[in-house]
Amino acid sequence: MTSERLYVWAWLPGASTPIVCGVVEERRGHHRFNYGRSYLENPDAVPLYGIPLQQGAAPLPNGLTLHGTLRDALPDAWGQHVILQRLTGRSGTSGDPAELSMMTYMRESSSDRFGALDFQESPTVYVDRSDSASLADLDEAAERLQRGDPLPRTLEAAFAHGTSIGGARPKATLTEGSLHWIAKFSSPAMRHEALALFLARRMGIDTVDFKLTGVRGRDVLLVRRFDRAEGGLRFMTVSGLTMLNLDEMFGRYATYPDLLDVLTSQGNDPARIGRDLFRRIAANIVLGNSDDHARNHAALWDGRHLRLSPAFDIDPCRSPGWDSNQAMAYGREGQRASTLKGLIRCAPTYRLSVTEATDIVDQCVAAVEDNWASALEHARLTASQAGALRNIILNKGIHDHRYAPRNG
């Protein structure tokens, strides 16, 4: 029987190779983590986020069965289904990922995972579980997996590229020369995301780099990885859920004000984080992205400070009507309605006056209105697709803030 113990390896800041930093063991559904002695004695060691550098089992935050910084390195729905299909032989994505343990996902997922951690069977020998694959192979593997078709041996390497990253839709990691990408495969949502990223950048949002490309007669969205430097250097990275000591079960309790508090107290630039976060919320509302849950926010961790990552996974998915809510509340009293007027009323939370907040919102709305045609062209959207998005983004509801009093 395979031991329910795995060793955690980490890439320290600036390091090109990993070192063992600790061990994780599963006992009755709870995962205990201990730093290794060699890591604690290493003068260059940095703490994993949320786990102080000290001997003994690190206590789990209330309600959690696995430290968030370790959970962030595991696959989400798509990657779990890929692993489930490989291990069980069942086709399609109808299986229940809960059939397999977190330890299994640690062991079976690719080493090219989110952030700068990996899981290994050995504390002394590191075995890289990531192979190269072409974009065409990745696309074909994703298509076959969605259909439930068996994969030929020639696509087995491509298969693994979908096992190490988060998200529910088909995607895979890709390396092109010295650059590292996440490939998102052909679907309407992929083009919608390209349009939203294009517009968000013109709103003044720091977004991930991205490009639309073609393979096998289909479009693929390539999103530049912010947890990798050019050449492959890895950055420790944590999700919003981890920053808030939450997991998926309790993710509904995540709020922007709580995230703001963490980034203010632990961030590298506390003076401007309120303004930056407010602009991102405004952009999400304008762009119809109501899927702004805590795992769709991240920060880079250097052992001392957090730095908000570029914005990613911006998806215009809100229904075109008025009654919509953001996944995370933006007000300290639970306000989450997808209206700009409601957001502006919460300006003091982000250390902004009403006038400053309204100016930011106006800039976001103007960016959409001024760049709509070029965004459609950039995202290669058809007339019918553009019409549907127009009802979501250029919706009368996004102008409601213009009737709010500017008295701040």
Annotated model-derived regions:
Residues 1-294, 298-408:
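Phosphate/dinucleotide-binding and metal-coordinating scaffold of catalytic cores
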